[in-house]
């Protein structure tokens, strides 16, 4: 691990549509409403856990908040941290601006953890990501993209289908109604997605099977796939689609949340684990992810592996899937955070050495 004591700024975003409410809550920055699961009473936030881990590692952590105002960007330009630990998901609540934040940090010449702007935008636009997967021979469900007034077909697809926003993450826009069985249901869902989220609708083959998550630590050249995590959907009521809906993931008071859980994937033979690992690594590299990331997959009953999407900056709370996988690999939470720091610092050091060599 990096031996030197580092000044590390935890960069995170907050937003509130009511500026008056924001002013009143300055001492307790609000999360985006759709991420409210992160602020469950008595549970530490991911940034608080990371802050404590950095202290245990001997570093000097601090918080840096992006609140959607230009002033916060100006303040970031004066940041003197040795490394930015990037936890941002949006700017002023706009998820499509996530890559802009990272691009801005790049322009400032600051070191930071996680994916660069290109990787974020490739992963965020699910239709583009799926085209890249297909180019690299990585299986992904056949799909079409519905824009207002036109549909862009990539393949012939058949029902049942799942319809979701092309740009959102965190299962936003995915509920029991997302799985459609006929043209009427499909068109109604497409219209709902376009109106509610102002986003193209991704129309995708619904793949029956197990929901498998592969956490990955490492660079493009050298990456380690952590033990597989399964979101067990088997106890969902009959007739309820076996999907990772928003309620399943975040709404603790719902029946579907209580009936599902993430756990170390069991009953996977070595060949299947290798196939899942190889697929996850291929997707990680295809989208140029780095330091850490998570690949969400479906394992079909016939053994086929389909990549559903990639998450370049997965949630790092200690009770969530990535940390769960790291723990199963033998890493404590503090060691996991230390590994991410080491990867980011090594990457920046190697880039500096390469630049210096090129100038000789």
Sequence positions of predicted segments:
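Alpha-helix N-cap recognition
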Residues: 68, 181-182, 332
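Phosphate-binding site of ATP-dependent enzymes
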Residues: 3, 183-263, 267-278, 301, ...
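ATP-dependent carboxylate activation and anion-phosphoryl transfer catalytic cores
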Residues: 132-137, 267-360
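Active-site nucleotide/adenylate-binding loops and adjacent lid/helix of ATP-dependent enzymes
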Residues: 6-12, 76-80, 120-202, 207-210, ...
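Hydrophobic beta-strand scaffold residues
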Residues: 61, 111-112, 140, 161, ...
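Short acidic/His/Gly/Ser-rich catalytic and metal-binding motifs that mark active-site loops
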Residues: 17-22, 169-172, 253-256, 319
């Amino acid at each position: 691990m990096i031996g030197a004591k580092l000044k590390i700024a935890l960069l995170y975003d907050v937003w509130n549509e009511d500026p008056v409410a924001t002013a009143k809550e300055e001492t307790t920055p609000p999360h985006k409403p759709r991420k409210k699961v992160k602020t469950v009473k008595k549970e530490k936030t991911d940034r608080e856990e990371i802050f404590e881990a950095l202290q245990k590692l001997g570093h000097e952590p601090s918080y840096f908040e992006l609140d959607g105002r230009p002033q916060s960007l100006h303040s970031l330009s004066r940041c003197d941290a040795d490394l930015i630990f990037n936890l941002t998901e949006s700017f002023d609540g706009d998820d499509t601006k996530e890559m802009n934040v990272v691009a801005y940090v790049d322009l400032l010449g600051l070191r930071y953890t996680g994916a660069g702007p290109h990787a974020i935008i490739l992963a965020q636009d699910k239709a583009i990501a799926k085209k890249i997967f297909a180019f690299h021979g990585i299986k992904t469900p056949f799909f079409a993209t519905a824009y207002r007034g036109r549909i862009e077909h990539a393949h012939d697809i058949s029902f049942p289908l799942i319809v979701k926003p092309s740009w959102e993450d965190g299962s936003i826009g995915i509920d029991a109604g997302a799985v459609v069985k006929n043209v009427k249901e499909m068109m109604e869902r497409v219209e709902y997605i376009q109106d509610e989220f102002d986003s193209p609708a991704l129309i995708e083959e619904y793949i029956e099977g197990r929901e498998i998550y592969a956490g990955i630590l490492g660079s493009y050249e050298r990456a380690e796939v952590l033990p597989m995590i399964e979101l067990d959907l088997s106890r969902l009521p009959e007739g309820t689609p076996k999907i990772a809906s928003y309620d399943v993931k975040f709404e603790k008071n719902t029946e579907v949340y209580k009936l599902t859980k993430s756990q170390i994937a069991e009953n996977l033979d070595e060949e299947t684990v290798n196939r899942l690992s190889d697929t996850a690594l291929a997707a990680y590299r295809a989208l140029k992810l780095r330091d850490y990331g998570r690949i969400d997959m479906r394992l079909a009953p016939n053994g086929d592996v389909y990549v559903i999407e990639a998450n370049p900056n997965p949630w790092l709370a200690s009770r969530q899937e990535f940390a769960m996988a790291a723990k199963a690999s033998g890493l404590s939470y503090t060691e996991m955070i230390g590994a991410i720091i080491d990867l980011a610092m090594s990457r920046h050091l190697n880039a500096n050495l390469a630049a210096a060599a090129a100038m000789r």
